[in-house]
Amino acid sequence: MEVPTARLLLLLLLGAWAPAPESASPEAPLLVNEDVKRTVDLSSHLAKVTAEVVLAHPGGGSTARAASFLLALEPELEARLAHLGVQVKGEDEEENNLEVRETKIKGKSGRFFTVKLPVALDPGAKVSVVVETVYTHVLQPYPTQITQSEKQFVVFEGNHYFYSPYPTKTQTMRVKLASRNVESYTKLGNPTRSEDLLDYGPFRDIPAYSQDTFKVHYENNSPFLTITSMTRVIEVSHWGNIAVEENVDLKHTGAVLKGPFSRYDYQRQPDSGIASIRSFKTILPAAAQDVYYRDEIGNVSTSHLLILDDSVEMEIRPRFPLFGGWKTHYIVGYNLPSYEYLYNLGDQYALKMRFVDHVFDEQVIDSLTVKIILPEGAKNIQVDSPYEISRAPDELHYTYLDTFGRPVIVAYKKNLVEQHIQDIVVHYTFNKVLMLQEPLLVVAAFYILFFTVIIYVRLDFSITKDPAAEARMKVACITEQVLTLVNKRIGLYRHFDETINRYKQSRDVSTLNSGKKSLETEHKALTSEIASLQSRLKTEGSDLCDKVSEMQKLDAQVKELVLKSAVEAERLVAGKLKKDTYIENEKLISGKRQELVTKIDHILDAL
């Protein structure tokens, strides 16, 4: 699909940005968190922490402007960080996300990040930012095993305070739970509880790097569904199609099922297996077609497909409900039109597709492998990713009519959530002449096949020769030629009969004489050829030679009768013979002639 030059150049300028960690500058001015409002969302199996921070530059004799600020992760949670995003408050567009670089601070362990401000902060100025973090596998089931009829409870441990390298003047924290059934929670600062909410604070004058364990034990029956491993294969064809296939390994990472499973109780009691997973919805692109869903056994017919205006919604229902510790594996595939995702300008191509797509709500992917299969002959491959990914050496993929293989881009990433559903751009060059390669290969293959068959049928692969068989083949060939010549000779008689009839009508003697001459000439030639073939049969020692000789004699009699019919016709036309007498004579001649022809036919059948 041709696109405007400006649009393609914009795609070509997009670049993946994954810088190495750097050290924070010691001369950076010390900032202050004037006000922090934290929201900890624990309503699903993810921990989503959002902090609205009013960042101030107090000055304190320093005239240096603050072009960036530092973020720190809680030591207990940093290993399970899946997503970190920072925005200026009030600017929700994705383009307004601030640049975040991982950094290090001397004398401090843990993970730190430098966030670049859109406008440098002058002394005495303030800026409001929103820090969003998502953590996976930090909600631990407690108890770790439950029966089918029991509810699921989990424990979360975090920090009461906003963990920051800067001091905080005031801070509040609101915790959103999955239910109002809470077993226990920490009581720092006399928190208030309302339904499924816990409100802490305000806390005042909190020093930098402050920590105080926050712990809550509550009921959470939301789907603890985790994709332990996923392989996403994208195969690009310049003939108008992009094939996508996803191999998914699923596991219920909640409390492990203890004891037996009763399907009767599961279907009879609505609250039986309340923490189990019956089904979930996958969102496919709106242009998806030829969708299939199968597992190791085969096609799964319990799935449902709903086509919407902006997407295709697929309800995936495994063959059995998933309880804690249970696993399943399935494959989803579909086709997409390439004109919606593939752009080109001359030999320059840009593929823009999602690195990972929606599998289910609140998704967690422990390990993702993405393989992008480009057309054979693609070169100068470059990958632009919106976040850091790991690349493996490119591979080669062979399929129908490939000669030297299709290049395959292999990329990996661990610990992904919904925020990672973003586009990846692959640039490459491709000579359009190579599109003729496969059709030409098909033509060449058929040409070679037919040529081989022609040569094969003409070759003699017998180890020893059979003289008798060869003789039979020669006799059969000669006999076939004799049959052809005899039929031609009989055709001459019929043609001469027509000549006699025309003569009787026109009374033109020249017509009859010309017919006689033609009959004699052609009959003589055919009879001579038959005699030659008769000699060859005699040479081969075939008893068919006698039958051909007998047929020659019968034919001579037929010829005499044919010529006699011509004489009778001349006498009739000249008035030397009455019509009644001519008719009777003609009947006698025709009868004898028919007997002779019948005998000839019997001989031909015997041949």
Curated annotation (Swiss-Prot):
According to its record, what are the GO cellular component terms? cytosol; oligosaccharyltransferase complex; oligosaccharyltransferase complex A; oligosaccharyltransferase complex B; rough endoplasmic reticulum
Q: Which residues lie on this side of the membrane: Lumenal?
A: 25-434
Bilayer-crossing residues are: 435-455
User: Pfam families attached here?
Assistant: Ribophorin_I
Family indicated by similarity: Belongs to the OST1 family.
The record's subunit annotation is:
Component of the oligosaccharyltransferase (OST) complex. OST exists in two different complex forms which contain common core subunits RPN1, RPN2, OST48, OST4, DAD1 and TMEM258, either STT3A or STT3B as catalytic subunits, and form-specific accessory subunits. STT3A complex assembly occurs through the formation of 3 subcomplexes. Subcomplex 1 contains RPN1 and TMEM258, subcomplex 2 contains the STT3A-specific subunits STT3A, DC2/OSTC, and KCP2 as well as the core subunit OST4, and subcomplex 3 contains RPN2, DAD1, and OST48.
The protein's role, per its UniProt record: Subunit of the oligosaccharyl transferase (OST) complex that catalyzes the initial transfer of a defined glycan (Glc(3)Man(9)GlcNAc(2) in eukaryotes) from the lipid carrier dolichol-pyrophosphate to an asparagine residue within an Asn-X-Ser/Thr consensus motif in nascent polypeptide chains, the first step in protein N-glycosylation. N-glycosylation occurs cotranslationally and the complex associates with the Sec61 complex at the channel-forming translocon complex that mediates protein translocation across the endoplasmic reticulum (ER). All subunits are required for a maximal enzyme activity.
Q: Per its record, how is this protein called by name?
A: Dolichyl-diphosphooligosaccharide--protein glycosyltransferase subunit 1
Q: Which organism is it from?
A: Canis lupus familiaris (Dog)
